[in-house]
Amino acid sequence: MKRLVLPLALVALAIPGIANAELPKDVQAAIAKMGHVNDPKTAPLFAPFHTAGIPSEIKVTRDLAFGSDPAQKLDVFTSGQGTGKPILIYVHGGGFTRGDKHRPGEFMYDNVAVWAVQHGMVGALTNYRLAPAAKYPSANDDVSAGVKYIRDHAREFGGDPNKIFVWGHSAGASLVAIMVSHPNFVKATGGTLAGAIITSGQYEFKAPHPYAGDDAAKVAEVNAVEGLKKTDIPLYFTRAEWDMPSQMQQGDMIDKTLTAAGKEHGFHLMAGHNHMSQVYSIDTGETQLAEPMLAFIQKYSANVKAASAK
């Protein structure tokens, strides 16, 4: 077995309402009551822990275009200080057919990028073209193009182009899994990745599929499992205790499959969480995901040769 062991004793943030780096009992109870569904009532549970908004010292640049399509845009969050920092790029979910990197007036998914900056990184949130109008490989082409844009401009943001980590959730996790399991999508970023964090995705697809299409043979080509066994990119997977049944099955399957293949990887079961709360918990003080994710980034940043200053 080659599962990564990461330290869980990092710094816990002091945010009102969440103490001891745990979900409040009432939030845990509400999540458990929802059950194994993707319930929109999850976001209001976490909104009170994100009322501070974006700290004034963080510089945010919205809607940087990496292509001509309106969906091909990303947001970048920086401290405006320092150089050579790791970069965390977040890929949102939405069933391949909906979703956005930023919802005006709401905390998601600025909370991810704010957390990244507050922990010594550059944070980025990227969009991509959506199905059914855009089928495979459109979204993966966009994720790769967004990463390439960040790589090409990394030094302008204070980042290191050799220390890029991509985190995907739900459909975004599937896109990241497809990306790292298909070398052509990694090559399109202009380099490699320092690591991939993959939260509650699907790694085996069946036709018909909203993104991969209706042709069974083509859908099979999109599947990520075999490529995940072979990639040299460090991998860290999570799923939630109260995840949807398909994500539970897929998360456990990929952990068991990679373990049986002797493929080193990280895997964490998010106790007390559901499909969305894993991401909503970031930058709240509840550190069940934030701590091991930061440890993963720190571990593999240290293993990467820093890019030259030029």
Regions found by a protein language model. Name each.
Residues 26-83:
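N-terminal cap/lid segment of alpha/beta-hydrolase-fold proteins
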Residues 84-95:
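Short beta-strand element of the alpha/beta-hydrolase
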Residues 91-93, 150, 239:
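The conserved beta1-alpha1 loop
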Residues 95-98, 103, 123, 149:
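Serine-hydrolase catalytic-loop signature spanning alpha/beta hydrolases and amidase-signature enzymes
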Residues 102-124:
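Short amphipathic alpha-helix adjacent to the substrate-entry channel of hydrolases
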Residues 145-213, 219:
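Primarily recognizes the serine-hydrolase "nucleophile elbow" in alpha/beta-hydrolase
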Residues 189-195, 200-260:
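The feature captures the conserved acid-bearing segment of alpha/beta-hydrolase catalytic domains
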Residues 238, 245-248, 252-255, 259-310:
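C-terminal catalytic histidine-bearing segment of alpha/beta-hydrolase fold enzymes
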